[in-house]
């Protein structure tokens, strides 16, 4: 009996590891030593070797996309080849995110940093593709200037600016060492390639110049000291991938001279694998799309190099969480008009994923949805890695359902079609308020996107000043719940699960209770109750229904004391006209009406957030919103909001006049409305826990 119990326990533990995606054992230095034949290595070897270079040259010759990238690079090199390389390092400002001084504002240091690094990198690649040593010598001039920098870490991430930042998940609060940041990780990754690509053309002193810089500014800052770097265990943070990739690639490129560096190669593998394990079971990433891209993109360079050097034995692309859903997140967050959902600090200004990254993920995982995303959404490549990592051979196959619930992070997207801008997209999120790094207090929030515009929007991120990552971030409207399309009861706002040097409270947040999708209707039910202190808001359930392709209905069930002031907040992304019984939203290519449906008196009132970055040059701005306001008459208040396209105000007025709401004795609710020749019915059945939408 005892043995049976032990076997059962071991089976459960094994299953939980597999389900979580932790499909690899920890890699040791010995494992790497056995897998890489260091004696056979000959530069270049990170991303291609001498033999494989022939295939790249053939691709440049025969593939128009690759040929265009290469010809553009050669044309740009005409400038770089005659550009003087300035050895006078500009002064770096002490507060580059506050812009107090001229050095903070002028951008000379960051320009110097970027120019020398980028030019060395691209000229080194040109040398490999042409064999012309003039490119190698000029690349070294830029590399030499970059190596002369005292540090490759930038001021915004050094003490004392970053000291007061709230530490992310799995990171101890007591952090005082900040000598390696994501800029340093990027620099390590790129300079590792410069060393690899220039090696054969350089004299020993020139090789040693770059080798010494990689050791001084990358390897010795981290090797043996991982416990003193906060990002080393921040597996839900993009920094983990960026920094570990840079360190690992520095180790790989220096293996001939320093074979002992297989220890940091193993460390990078293990830590990046742990980051990949934190991808959601559907591919979601809590920080948002932009930071999914940064972490996965930079990690893919290390993953590719290590896979090559170990002949596929140690392949991070086989991580279960990554392999099962390599591009689900960027695909489902995509919006017509070359945009993406901008929840959290993720930006949303373009589609997610560099073409070469999606090429690589699609090829390595053989995922047809990834190939379809590459061939149907992204533009032509314009990066040297679009030559090294070419398009997948398949054009791919679209997902069967364009709607998605990312279960691990509880984000959701409801839509009729990926490509058609004339069909409404509704998206929102629940989940936990436990990402103090890039998360917002936005549980229960949603947006409405149509005709390439947000009609109901997310404010996106604030500019990154010196306080935005401190506890003060939750006072910025961009991060506070008051700056999202949520509920306020007597002004009560959502709270964070993590504050500065305080323990996490993982109970704070919300959840998706139900997500259903079909050809004709999508439905989500969220419970954001525990995102609040619950002194005023006792309970909140939000149902969102999309009757495809364009009619959205939102039902908010709010429990509070009687006579509480309840506000349903909306942030418009277009022009707004407030009327007594409805709101007109006018975009560039169409109009929508937002119509409250209530059985009690309500008001629609406009307001404005104040928004001011802590920055000497950033201007103050107002941010518009409007509220549907009611005073609760009893413990439970039901507020219904209809959002749909209309021709004009007259059609909206007719919809208001024809709508009806019936509340049955058991509390079930039926809403009927007419739009033109179409009739719509929404029925919510009362259950023990609240109202449930029934098709």
Predicted feature descriptions by range:
Residues 11-20:
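Bacterial N-terminal signal peptides
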Residues 25-26, 467-695:
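CBM-like, beta-strand-rich accessory domains located in the C-terminal region of large
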Residues 27-103:
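Low-complexity, Ser/Thr/Pro/Gly-enriched N-terminal "stalk/linker" regions
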Residues 172-290, 386-400:
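Active-site lining segments of carbohydrate-active enzymes
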């Amino acid at each position: 009996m005892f043995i049976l119990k032990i076997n059962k326990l071991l089976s459960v533990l094994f299953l939980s590891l597999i389900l979580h995606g932790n499909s690899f054992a920890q890699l040791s230095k010995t494992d790497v030593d056995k897998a890489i034949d260091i004696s056979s290595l000959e530069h270049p070897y990170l991303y291609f070797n001498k033999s494989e270079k022939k295939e790249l040259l053939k691709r440049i010759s025969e593939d128009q996309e690759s040929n265009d990238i290469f010809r553009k690079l050669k044309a740009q090199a005409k400038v770089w080849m005659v550009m003087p390389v300035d050895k006078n390092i500009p002064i770096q400002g002490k507060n580059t995110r506050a812009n107090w001084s001229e050095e903070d504002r002028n951008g000379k240091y960051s320009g110097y940093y970027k120019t020398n690094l980028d030019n060395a990198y691209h000229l080194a690649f040109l040398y490999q593709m042409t064999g012309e040593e003039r490119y190698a010598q000029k690349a070294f001039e830029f590399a030499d200037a970059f190596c002369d920098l005292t540090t490759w870490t930038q001021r915004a991430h050094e003490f004392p600016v970053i000291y007061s930042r709230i530490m992310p998940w799995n990171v101890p609060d007591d952090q005082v060492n900040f000598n390696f940041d994501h800029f340093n990780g990027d620099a390590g990754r790129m300079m590792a390639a410069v060393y690899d690509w220039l090696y054969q053309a350089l004299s020993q002193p020139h090789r040693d110049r770059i080798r010494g810089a990689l050791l001084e500014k990358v390897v010795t800052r981290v090797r043996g000291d991982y416990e003193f770097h906060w990002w080393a265990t921040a597996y839900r943070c993009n920094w983990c991938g960026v920094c570990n990739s840079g360190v690992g690639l520095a180790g790989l490129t220096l293996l001939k001279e320093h074979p002992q560096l297989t220890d940091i190669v193993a460390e990078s593998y293990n830590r990046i694998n742990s980051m990949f394990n934190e991808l959601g079971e559907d591919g979601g990433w809590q920080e948002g799309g932009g930071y999914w891209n940064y972490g996965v993109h930079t990690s893919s360079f290390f993953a590719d190099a290590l896979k090559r050097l170990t002949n596929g034995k140690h392949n991070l692309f086989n991580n279960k969480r990554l392999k099962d859903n390599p591009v689900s997140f960027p695909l489902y967050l995509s919006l017509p008009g070359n945009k993406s959902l901008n929840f959290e600090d993720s930006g949303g200004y373009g589609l997610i994923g560099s073409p070469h990254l999606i090429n690589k993920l699609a090829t390595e995982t053989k995922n047809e949805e990834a190939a379809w995303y590459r061939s149907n959404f992204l533009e032509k490549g314009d990066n040297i890695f679009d030559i090294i990592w070419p398009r997948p051979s398949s054009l791919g196959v679209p997902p069967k359902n364009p709607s998605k619930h990312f279960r691990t992070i509880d984000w959701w997207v409801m839509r009729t079609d990926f490509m058609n801008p004339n069909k409404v997209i509704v998206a929102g999120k629940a989940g936990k308020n436990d990402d103090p790094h890039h998360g917002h207090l936005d549980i229960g929030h949603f947006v409405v996107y149509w005709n390439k515009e947000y009609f109901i929007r997310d404010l996106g991120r604030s500019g990154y000043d010196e306080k935005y990552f401190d506890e003060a971030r939750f006072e910025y409207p961009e991060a506070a719940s008051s700056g999202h399309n949520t509920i306020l009861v007597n002004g009560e706002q959502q709270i964070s699960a993590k504050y500065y040097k305080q323990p996490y409270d993982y109970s704070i947040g919300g959840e998706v209770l139900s997500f259903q999708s079909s050809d004709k209707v999508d439905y989500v039910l969220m419970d954001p109750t525990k995102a609040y202190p619950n002194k005023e808001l006792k309970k909140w359930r939000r149902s969102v229904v999309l009757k495809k392709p364009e009619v959205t209905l939102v039902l908010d069930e709010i429990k509070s004391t009687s006579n509480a002031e309840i506000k349903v907040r909306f942030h418009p992304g277009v022009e707004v006209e407030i009327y007594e019984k409805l709101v007109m939203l006018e975009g560039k290519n169409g109009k929508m009406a937002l119509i409250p449906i209530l059985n009690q008196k309500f008001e629609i009132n406009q307001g404005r957030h104040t928004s001011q970055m802590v920055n000497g040059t950033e201007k103050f701005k107002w941010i518009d919103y409007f509220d549907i306001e009611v005073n609760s008459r009893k413990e439970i208040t039901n507020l219904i909001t209809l959002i749909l396209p209309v021709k004009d105000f007259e059609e909206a007025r007719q919809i208001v006049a024809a709508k009806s709401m019936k509340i049955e004795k058991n509390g079930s609710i039926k809403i009927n409305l007419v739009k033109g020749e179409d009739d719509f019915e929404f029925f919510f059945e009362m259950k023990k826990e609240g109202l449930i939408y029934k098709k």
